[in-house]
Amino acid sequence: MLEQLQTLKNEAETQINEASDLKTLNDLRVKYLGKKGPMTEIMKQMGKLSAEERPKMGSLANEVRTALTEAISSKQQILETEAINEKLKSETIDVTLPGTAPSIGTKHLLTQVIEEMEDMFIGMGYEIAEGPEVELDYYNFEALNLPKDHPARDMQDSFYITENTLLRTQTSPVQARTMEKHDFSKGPIKVICPGKVYRRDNDDATHSHQFTQIEGLVVGENITFADLKGTLTVLAKTMFGEEREIRLRPSFFPFTEPSVEMDISCFKCGGKGCRVCKGTGWIEILGSGMVHPNVLEMSRIDSTRYSGFAFGLGPERVAMLKYAVDDIRHLYTNDLRFTKQFQSTETGEI
C-alpha cells in the first residue's frame, strides 16, 4: 500500500502540473480525490490492515490527500491568473487611439431666432426682463388696461388655475411689473421680455396653444411714435432683410393708443394668397403702439410727464418667415429630419 500511495502521488502531481486549463484540472481533482477515485479506494482498504500498520498508513494516506489538494489549489490559482491575463491582453484598449466622438446637439431653430433677436435689441441698449409664467390675473389683465369684463378674460381664451391666477397669455405682465418698480432717476425703461405664453387656441399652421413671445417696452420722457416706427424699421431690416415687403396698419389694443400692426408678405405664396396666410397674402408679425396712459398710471407713472411704446412678436412667426417653414407645428414635433436643416454652426452638428 505504501508503494501504491507513492505511485499515486507522483502520477497525480505530474498530471496536475501538466494541466493547461481549469477544466482539465477539475477533471483531475474528480479523478484522484472524488468519491470513486483511487484515494477513496485506498482509504476503504485501511480496515484490512493490522492494528500496527493502520495508524501509519492512515497518516500517510492523509498526507498524500493533503499534498494533492494543495497541488490542485496552487495550480488553480496559476491557471486563473493566466486566464485573467490572457483576457486582459485580448481586451486591452489602446487609449492613445482616437475615440468615437459622441453626437453633439445644436441649438433649436427657435432658440437661434430668440437669441438673434435678443442680441439685436441688446445692441440697441435694451435689457432682458423675465417674470413668472403662472401669473396673477391683475398683472396679466387689469394692470394692462383690460377690465374684469374684457372678453380676453373668458375661460375659453385662457388657462385659469384659480380664480385669480392663470398661465400668462402674453409676456406683457413682465412690462407691468417692470414699470411698477422702476426708478426713473436711473434712466428710462428699455427692456425686452422673452418667454412662453399660453392661450386656448386651436392648433393649426399658424397657431399653437403654447408659443413664445418677445415683447419690448420703452418708457421715458419725450418718447414718440417716431421712435416706435424707427425701432420697427430696424427690427424688420435686421430680421427679414430689405427684400421683404412690409406694411403697417392701424389696429387696436387695450394697452396701447394709438396702435399699429406690422405685416410681412407671405413667404409661401409671395402675396398671392394661400392656406398659410389664409388667402390674404400677408402674415401678421407683431402688434405695437404707444403705451396707454391708463397703463402708465396703473404703475404709478405720471402719464403727463412720461410716455412710451410697446411691441410684441412671436419668434415662431419670425422663424417661419425667415426659413420658409410652412407650418408652426414643425417647430414642436422634434423631427430630426426637420431640425437638422437648421444646424447652428456655433455648437456643432446634431
From Swiss-Prot:
One Gene Ontology CC term in the entry: cytoplasm
Tell me the cofactors it needs: Mg(2+)
What is the name of the protein in this document? Phenylalanine--tRNA ligase alpha subunit
Protein EC: 6.1.1.20
**Domain of life here?**
Bacteria
Q: GO BP, one example?
A: phenylalanyl-tRNA aminoacylation
* Cofactor detail note: Binds 2 magnesium ions per tetramer.
* Subunit structure, interactors included: Tetramer of two alpha and two beta subunits.
Family the entry assigns: Belongs to the class-II aminoacyl-tRNA synthetase family. Phe-tRNA synthetase alpha subunit type 1 subfamily.
> What does the entry list as the binding residues for Mg(2+)?
E257
Q: GO molecular-function annotation terms?
A: ATP binding; catalytic activity, acting on a protein; magnesium ion binding; phenylalanine-tRNA ligase activity; transferase activity; tRNA binding
Where it sits in the cell: the answer is: Cytoplasm
Q: Which gene encodes it?
A: pheS
Q: Which UniProt keywords apply?
A: Aminoacyl-tRNA synthetase, ATP-binding, Cytoplasm, Ligase, Magnesium, Metal-binding, Nucleotide-binding, Protein biosynthesis
Reactions listed under catalytic activity: tRNA(Phe) + L-phenylalanine + ATP = L-phenylalanyl-tRNA(Phe) + AMP + diphosphate + H(+)
